[in-house]
């Protein structure tokens, strides 16, 4: 039975909810996707909707936007019941959904995109002047810096997003749903979007914000509602938000259990040794050891050289100096193929551009690194590859209907597990992970942490690069910190230098000495 968490959120006494969804249920082929979900949104509120993949967030929002029709439940706008049967009736009710994949016509002007399907006319002709004037007014209200006559395809992604928002405002929308709106944005573009969202909030527009990025939720949300397994778990106010409570609500267990790794007090023998490795530019001569069953965290600010170290070891980039040893034997690694041949794996930070073959099947993506090993007289042993892929799907809880599903059609979390499965198929002695949970929801993070901990327990030596300090602190047996291309510090609880976020940042910024444990 689900227990709801009460909230102290106190809207003005006279405030009527702009949106109430009560008892919403939806089934697909008899399987419940939503079960009695409630959601209440107030004017001028940024309301975050959170939950892991499959929790029901997208289904609930598609019902609100008219893409699906609920099997049960009621929707009220400003206290009045409404029937939303298609996207048109949703827009008439003042609801607009801005998808992660932008819905703009790149070859048309900003004005033409804003008024698409609702053009202004004078007699039998389009009234372009009136449309451009109204478009300019809406864009000005958003603080946009581009012109109504600009071609949308020439704009940055963040500006194209503003075009979509402008189109919604032109339709007098009072409820905006934003689904992972920062997924393709830079940090600067993200902050610009936040400014727009805050302005919309001040204008009384309600925003339902879907994101797995905790830092965005803390920066924007007035309240948070959480779904899990198609059920409403509860809501929190800004004051009640904490990582511990969110994790417990989303995955059903405490933060203490989130990072399952038990720190190694007596790690195994040295497996990987790096001596004075350098690319002559971004990485100054760096030396360290990595032991069997150890998770070695590599921390530092963006641009510190962490990724570059991993790529040098893997042979993806050319080193100008340094040596790499595996089990005491000097390696000659000139390419990733050389690294793979000796049992060194590397999960890159950008799974879409550097890791996966998106149009290829899940089966082939998983088996890619085993094809050479399993080839016999030029004939691939697909039976072996199929078994590896089937076992990986089961062991890693990869959610897909069948092995022929393309990687591009999977969620971020399942894509990342697919990539992990590919590297584990070669039975690596050393596995380097670069931002292993970037762009995945909290449920997938928990599963990936379990996989990493299991590998460590099996004796795999793991080098983990991460910008998420709780991840580094929660999983690492030791932590090396880089600053401006140099290794500047080591944290290890067993030698009296405590692994904490504060101590990592002291080294990363050069601010002060670390705190002893």
From Swiss-Prot:
Pfam families: ABC_tran. ATP binds at residues 51-58. Keywords: ATP-binding, Cell inner membrane, Cell membrane, Membrane, Nucleotide-binding, Repeat, Sugar transport, Translocase, Transport. One of its GO terms (cellular component) is plasma membrane. Its EC number is 7.5.2.7. GO terms for molecular function: ABC-type D-ribose transporter activity; ATP binding; ATP hydrolysis activity. Gene3D superfamilies: P-loop containing nucleotide triphosphate hydrolases (3.40.50.300). It is found in: Cell inner membrane. It is a peripheral membrane protein. InterPro entries: AAA+_ATPase (IPR003593), ABC_carbohydrate_import_ATPase (IPR050107), ABC_transporter-like_ATP-bd (IPR003439), ABC_transporter-like_CS (IPR017871), P-loop_NTPase (IPR027417). Coiled coil: none annotated. Part of the ABC transporter complex RbsABC involved in ribose import. Responsible for energy coupling to the transport system. This is Ribose import ATP-binding protein RbsA. It comes from Trichormus variabilis (strain ATCC 29413 / PCC 7937) (Anabaena variabilis). The gene is rbsA.
């Amino acid at each position: 039975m689900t227990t709801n968490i009460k909230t102290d959120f106190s809207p003005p006494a006279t405030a009527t909810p702009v949106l109430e969804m009560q008892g919403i249920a939806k089934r697909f082929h008899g399987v419940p996707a939503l079960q009695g979900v409630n959601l209440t949104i107030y004017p001028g509120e940024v309301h975050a909707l959170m939950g892991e993949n499959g929790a029901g967030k997208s289904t609930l929002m598609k019902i609100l936007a008219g893409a699906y029709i609920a099997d049960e439940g009621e929707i009220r706008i400003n206290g009045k019941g409404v029937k939303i049967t298609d996207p048109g009736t949703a827009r008439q009710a003042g609801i607009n959904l801005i998808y992660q994949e932008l819905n703009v016509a790149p070859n048309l002007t900003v004005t033409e995109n804003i008024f698409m399907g609702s053009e202004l006319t004078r007699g039998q002709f389009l009234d372009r002047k009136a449309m451009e004037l109204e478009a300019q007014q809406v864009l000005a209200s958003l603080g946009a810096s581009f012109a109504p006559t600009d071609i949308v395809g020439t704009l940055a992604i963040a500006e194209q997003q503003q075009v979509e928002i402008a189109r919604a405002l032109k339709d007098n929308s009072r409820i905006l749903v934003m689904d992972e709106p920062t997924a393709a944005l830079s940090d600067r573009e993200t902050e610009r979007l936040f400014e727009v969202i805050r302005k919309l909030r001040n204008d009384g527009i309600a925003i339902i914000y879907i994101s797995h990025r905790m830092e965005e939720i803390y920066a924007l949300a007035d309240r948070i509602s959480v779904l899990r397994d198609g059920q409403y778990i509860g809501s929190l106010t800004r004051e009640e938000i904490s990582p511990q409570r969110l994790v417990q609500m989303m995955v059903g267990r405490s933060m203490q259990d989130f990072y399952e790794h038990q720190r190694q007090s007596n790690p195994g023998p040295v497996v990987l040794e790096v001596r004075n490795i350098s690319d002559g530019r971004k990485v100054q001569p760096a030396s360290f050891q990595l032991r069997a069953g150890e998770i070695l965290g590599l921390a530092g600010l963006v641009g510190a050289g962490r990724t570059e170290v991993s790529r040098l070891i893997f042979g993806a980039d050319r080193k100008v100096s340094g040596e790499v040893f595996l089990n005491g034997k000097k390696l000659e690694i000139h390419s990733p193929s050389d690294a793979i041949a000796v049992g060194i794996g590397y999960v890159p930070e950008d799974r879409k551009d550097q890791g996966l073959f998106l149009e290829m099947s899940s089966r082939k993506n998983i088996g890619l690194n085993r094809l050479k090993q399993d080839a016999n007289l030029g004939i691939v042993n697909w039976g072996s590859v199929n078994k590896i892929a089937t076992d990986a799907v089961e062991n890693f809880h990869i959610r897909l209907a069948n092995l022929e599903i393309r990687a591009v059609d999977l969620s971020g979390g399942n894509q990342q597990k697919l990539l992990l499965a590919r590297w584990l198929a070669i039975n690596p002695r050393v596995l380097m992970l670069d931002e292993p949970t970037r762009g995945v929801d909290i449920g997938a993070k928990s599963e990936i942490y379990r996989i990493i901990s299991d590998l460590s327990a099996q004796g795999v030596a793991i080098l983990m690069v991460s910008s998420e300090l709780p991840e580094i602190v929660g999983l690492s047996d030791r932590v090396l910190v880089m600053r401006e291309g140099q290794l500047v510090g080591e944290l290890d609880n067993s030698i009296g230098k405590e692994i904490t976020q504060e101590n990592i940042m002291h080294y990363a910024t050069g601010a002060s000495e670390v705190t002893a444990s």
